[in-house]
UniProtKB/Swiss-Prot annotation:
This is Retinoic acid receptor alpha. The keyword Methyltransferase does not apply. A zinc finger (NR C4-type) spans 80-100, 116-140. Residues 47-61 have a biased composition (Polar residues). Keywords: DNA-binding, Metal-binding, Nucleus, Receptor, Transcription, Transcription regulation, Zinc, Zinc-finger.
Length: 447
């Protein structure tokens, strides 16, 4: 008990001053603290908090800086599972290079349909991966690339966008408007519309289907040759096309020529008479088209023409869709596939803006148009096979330009044109691309 007049001593526990605990057992104070004694005031100090004591107990250690940790070694991925090229990481479930990642993504997003012109067992490696798109896609799937991952990735991007249809401003920039006008002009100069033509008909084999009407074939092959030349003229007017290597220009024309020919003739379909009209005005019904050389393609082409009717495409849209068909980086044997894709991007954007400005209440019209490219490719693959069988049916030889431009469509083996060095003379592969032949050839009309 403290004497009278003496200061009241600090609180004690079992005869020891409390503060001594902070020095004898600092490691225990994080969980233990002495109980407060009721009625005894605390003078001159307060019990240190566990955080303060912890700081005191470790302050000496913090004075000495720890050595910096070494940077982690660069991550090394296994070679691309598809082509064995250097991998850039794991994409869609497997280790893959940028090329195979992009090829797989485009193939799934665009629902591409490929055809193998060999035995569906092509070797896919760094050198051969662009030669057969069918086998390359199959290899992507075999090694474990996931279609669902592509779709999920696309859906995620869509969700991240805040209602794009509400906030997108479909205003044509001056550059985009200039591009649309340029493509429209190129299309109109190489393909007159139906309303500009004076129709005429023929009675040749109009009643029943036959294997081949030679007179109709002669006329049809003449018009088709002119149409191919006009397609080349159209291509040369597209932004950036002539900046590609000559080899790539020829590869793209061979791959897309039949797509463009079918798209064009189908825009001249008259459903009331079930007829199609060529650029000289010749109008053939379904039976005559069959007998002129279309054969088993006839019903496919007429069905496609019927599918185009609800789209009500004008010259700008037909020209842009033709240009998109042509400038497609997925074509096999391209030397500069990435450059082709870069040329295609502004065409896609121009078509999207133009279509949605023209039809503001039909937001699905643009994707519907793009889906027609898949239909065209499917018909064209059968069309290239039809050119081969025609050679056995016609009495004479196949017109050289038709054979060169259509038979070799997307890799049918009639000469390895796609592998020709880019420095080779243009005329050595395609007369229509040769400047000399372009100057000497008379003005033509396309079918």
């Amino acid at each position: 008990m403290a004497g009278k007049g003496n200061p009241v001593p600090g609180p004690h526990l079992n005869g020891f001053p409390v503060p001594t605990y902070s020095y004898f057992f600092p490691h225990m104070l994080g969980s233990l603290s002495p109980p407060a004694l009721p009625g005894l005031p605390i003078s001159g100090y307060s019990t240190p908090s566990p955080a303060t004591i912890e700081t005191q107990s470790t302050s000496s250690e913090e004075i000495v800086p720890s050595p910096p940790s070494p940077p982690p070694p660069p991550r090394v991925y296994k070679p691309c599972f598809v082509c064995q090229d250097k991998s850039s990481g794991y994409h869609y479930g497997v280790s893959a290079c940028e090329g195979c990642k992009g090829f797989f993504r485009r193939s799934i997003q665009k629902n591409m349909v490929y055809t193998c012109h060999r035995e569906k067992n092509c070797i896919i490696n760094k050198v051969t991966r662009n030669r057969c798109q069918y086998c390359r896609l199959q290899k992507c799937l075999e090694v474990g690339m996931s279609k669902e991952s592509v779709r999920n990735d696309r859906n995620k991007k869509k969700k991240d966008e805040k209602k794009p249809e509400c906030i997108e401003n479909y205003v044509l920039s001056p550059d985009t408007e200039q591009m649309i006008n340029r493509v429209r002009k190129a299309h109109q100069e190489t393909f007159p519309s139906l309303c500009q033509l004076g129709k005429y008909t023929t009675t040749n084999s109009s009643e029943r289907r036959v294997a081949l009407d030679v007179d109709l074939w002669d006329k049809f092959s003449e018009l088709s040759t002119k149409c191919i030349i006009k397609t080349v003229e159209f291509a040369k007017q597209l932004p950036g096309f002539v900046t590609l290597t000559i080899a790539d220009q020829i590869t793209l024309l061979k791959a897309a020529c039949l797509d463009i020919l079918i798209l064009r003739i189908c825009t001249r379909y008259t459903p009331e008479q079930d007829t199609m009209t060529f650029s000289d005005g010749l109008t053939l019904n379904r039976t005559q088209m069959h007998n002129a050389g279309f054969g088993p393609l006839t019903d496919l082409v007429f069905a496609f023409a019927n599918q185009l009717l609800p789209l009500e495409m004008d010259d700008a849209e037909t020209g842009l869709l033709s240009a998109i068909c042509l400038l497609c980086g997925d074509r096999q044997d391209l030397e500069q596939a990435e450059k082709v894709d870069i040329l295609q991007e502004p065409l896609l954007e121009a078509l999207k803006i133009y279509v949605r400005r023209r039809r503001p209440h039909k937001p699905h019209m643009f994707p519907k148009m793009l889906m027609k490219i898949t239909d065209l490719r499917s018909i064209s693959a059968k069309g290239a096979e039809r050119v081969i069988t025609l050679k056995m049916e016609i009495p004479g030889s196949m017109p050289p330009l038709i054979q060169e431009m259509l038979e070799n469509s997307e890799g049918l083996e009639s000469g390895a044109t796609g592998s020709r060095p880019s420095g080779a003379p243009p005329g050595s592969c395609s007369p229509s691309l040769s400047p000399s032949s372009a100057q000497s050839s008379p003005p033509t009309q396309s079918p």
